[in-house]
UniProtKB/Swiss-Prot annotation:
One of its GO terms (cellular component) is mitochondrial membrane. It comes from the Eukaryota. The lineage of its organism: Eukaryota, Fungi, Dikarya, Ascomycota, Saccharomycotina. This is NADH-ubiquinone oxidoreductase chain 6. It catalyses: a ubiquinone + NADH + 5 H(+)(in) = a ubiquinol + NAD(+) + 4 H(+)(out). It is a multi-pass membrane protein. PANTHER family: NADH-UBIQUINONE OXIDOREDUCTASE CHAIN 6. Keywords: Electron transport, Membrane, Mitochondrion, NAD, Respiratory chain, Translocase, Transmembrane, Transmembrane helix, Transport, Ubiquinone.
Amino acid sequence: MLYNIININILNSNILLDIISILSIISSIAIILVSNPMYSILYLIILFINIAIYLYLIGISIMSLLYILVYIGAIAVLFLFILSLFTALPYLLESKNLKITELNNTFLHKNNNIPLFILIIIIFYYNMINYFNNIYLNNNNINNNNINNLDNINNILLNNDWYKIFDINHLNQIGFLLYTEYSILLIFISFLLLFSILSAIVLTHNK
């Protein structure tokens, strides 16, 4: 019974990871093919969200949090702010409204993007073949060699002190390294973000 429940959970988790991976690939392709920079940045944010969810599901929660804070919270929002001032506002004033058909016309109607799109499809197809081959080999190895080990999984779950495994806090370790060994880099990155915000304000004021 426990073996069947674990298999169902693993299968559902793998399906969810596959869906997130496919959405990430679609978002990355849309970033390249969309000509409007505003839509490109929006697809970039969607890509970062998918990557953060993927990292959280595989157990790397700290990297997922960093993706949301750094990429989505700082870089993507800053790009959206700048692009909205210098590109989206004149575009809105000229066209009066955003036409949804223009978003559809940007896909596969740009001749210069078709070779790049074909190259991405070939790379994606090659990686998917290797991915499914590895899954098939891993499933065969599990079915042939590890059935006896899975019979004792109930004893493993009940007899181990799991709180000792999670006793180490990754967030505390990263914070300690950032403020001690890599403090100069942290200050340098802070100044870069400060200068980027100030430059955006100055350019907006001059405009």
